[in-house]
């Protein structure tokens, strides 16, 4: 298959590829990761390289460097030997021709689609862009695979989200729980979810959704609430900051560790048949409880006073460490998310092992080290 010529004139008929040809194709172990420079993409790249894959990643062109999370891989001579185990390519989920070109050139055996505008609150400010990237971008990537006649050969993973459940219809949420999205981000991801199902059913593509509940790590983006908390706690411990402003302290979430969740992504694509899975811990904590755990790591116990936007968290000396600001509330809040991971445990043999206290401990320690080395980080 050479260049774009192989992708022109593709019919919508379902092709049948001989088993021997499929086996030989998959034995190549070539992965393409969109969103490779993000939290999940960086952990997934590490995992796949450790399993002997050739890893290709798509990054967006930027005037500033945005590859900090994967710099250790890109500069590692072990991933830049003669067979080029790790490669990065410029691309964008809004550019169909670029995606077709990459798919036809790389011919991946597995595609992990992680790229997204993934900040829920930002999606209210940028609803059209969020839909363009998260919804239509997923379609573009699936259609690129189909256009390049790789529909039967490629295994496709779509990073779906617990935000699909939004105004939850049952607790806990499983693969059978009805969706009720409460943000432009969640609505866009719901389209992504169903277009994956559609391509699986229409073209017999090995296409899967991982409905991942919140997952964190020291590599989490600084604007997400968990990382915002641990960064602020680190700064407070070093005298660089006095307090932190947050939104809904009572919001309940099912938090896990991103490093474990990318293992689930890989297992989903190694399963015998394509399917959709909830990936979660099955345990729930509030934002307030996350704050308590984080401050405990620097020896401070918080006492909470007031309600709503008047609520504050004070240390034993009466110093206010946590304040509530209306600007961090979403127009439509998602009050509670709790996943039921039984299907993943039974079918994939996957279950979360890192507890939330362990996760918080790791994140706070990492941010303290970061702030000591670079107070302006």
Swiss-Prot record:
Its cofactor is NADP(+). It catalyses: GDP-alpha-D-mannose = GDP-4-dehydro-alpha-D-rhamnose + H2O. It holds the Pfam family GDP_Man_Dehyd. Keywords: Insecticide resistance, Lyase, NADP. It comes from Caenorhabditis briggsae. Its EC number is 4.2.1.47. Pathway: Nucleotide-sugar biosynthesis; GDP-L-fucose biosynthesis via de novo pathway; GDP-L-fucose from GDP-alpha-D-mannose: step 1/2. This is GDP-mannose 4,6 dehydratase 1. Belongs to the NAD(P)-dependent epimerase/dehydratase family. GDP-mannose 4,6-dehydratase subfamily. It comes from the Eukaryota. One of its GO terms (biological process) is 'de novo' GDP-L-fucose biosynthetic process. One of its GO terms (molecular function) is GDP-mannose 4,6-dehydratase activity. Catalyzes the conversion of GDP-D-mannose to GDP-4-dehydro-6-deoxy-D-mannose. Involved in susceptibility to pore-forming crystal toxins in conjunction with bre-2, bre-3 and bre-4. Has a role in determining brood size. Coiled coil: none annotated.
